[in-house]
């Protein structure tokens, strides 16, 4: 957004989203708002005042007015929320690479059952702000571990591009290192650990269940890409996304597809999908469901009519509530 002093932009930074002012002269940007918070794109700049939505560990978002280098919070949407604290977590992958994330713990001493929650993208990030899913699961008694393995945004281009062409195997290394770091903090029950995620997070859930199933008691995969070959032809972004992330050689897509390795899955597996998902079409869920059921794996498929890829964020309130109920019911039965 242009202002008198430069262009305001938001930049992802280790789970935060900084608001920067880039001078027209091309000199180093100034940090307008930094620290462990997330900002949306600011509103139009008028009379020397810029308004931005800012979220942190206490609120999912407040409007903040920026004037003369100072901040004034205009709203109090999160004032009455009873949120559980977010703990920063740092781990180390076997190759020495740092892995960054967070834990949201339930109240009480534990030991608590654990959920490894994996974000989509993969070039997105979890962050410092209040996240409804982590809060719901932690409030129900589960310690939620979430982080930004290589392939995520917010840590530089090399971090984001690291997994290209070998997505499942390389992502799993960092995710398991993050889980190990969380378990080492104490108060968590490693024998009652589940894994879940949506979109790319669902891809990784299936991959981990197949290749590292001994680490988990059960899994939930949502709106996932499971078979790269059919995704390439059926997804609204398949023609470009597939080659950018999984490589130019279609012969390698089979080995990288979680569906290829589903014959190794033995743990209970819940698949959640939307019938009008054009990003990861419903056939991705159906193919995995059929393969697991034919092998006798305890598997359930929950389909939401009239919903798309964004069900968990912008679906009908009744469907979003039903989804949470199904997820908590599954963990209640298996963890």
Regions found by a protein language model. Give the residues of each.
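Peripheral, non-catalytic segments that deliver or gate enzyme domains
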Residues: 1-110, 122-140, 181-184
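Conserved hydrophobic/aromatic "anchor" residues
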Residues: 91, 112, 142, 216, ...
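Histidine-centered divalent metal-coordination motifs
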Residues: 100, 119, 309
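A fold-wide structural signal in alpha/beta-hydrolase
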Residues: 114, 138-148, 300
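Conserved beta-strand elements of the Class I
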Residues: 114-116, 270
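The conserved beta1-alpha1 loop
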Residues: 118-120, 273
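Active-site-proximal cap/loop segments of hydrolase catalytic domains
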Residues: 149-335
